[in-house]
Swiss-Prot record:
Disulfide bonds: none annotated. Residues 1-20 form the signal peptide. Keywords: Membrane, Phosphoprotein, Signal, Transmembrane, Transmembrane helix. GO terms for cellular component: membrane. The gene is Smim24. The keyword Phosphoprotein applies. It comes from Mus musculus. It comes from the Eukaryota. It is a single-pass membrane protein. This is Small integral membrane protein 24. The lineage of its organism: Eukaryota, Metazoa, Chordata, Craniata, Vertebrata.
Amino acid sequence: MDTLGRLLLLATLFLTPAEAQQASERRLKPWLVGLAAVVGFLFIVFILMLANRVWCAKGRAEDEEATFRMEHIMNENSQPSKADKKQKKKVDRKGGQSNEALELEEKESSDEERGKKTAL
């Protein structure tokens, strides 16, 4: 019976009817409410970004080691071989590579100029 009495006492304390507050005369302007909403939203996004950064963070030593490995591999691969150097010298001796698209445009423009210079 003691527990039943305690439950009834707690029920009457927590389930008492709520009284409405008096309406305050002071209300915020609409632009201030919007500004507060935007600031609140940006604050929530900031907190979520911090949580994401902490949650998904990796160890710095691992990142630096992987970067060092990649740079080392890239430096080894970036050194041109002797065959590549010889081929480049041959292309330079021949006068370089030609841009066929540019030559085609030059030919078309010369055809148009001929059409303009015809006498009537």
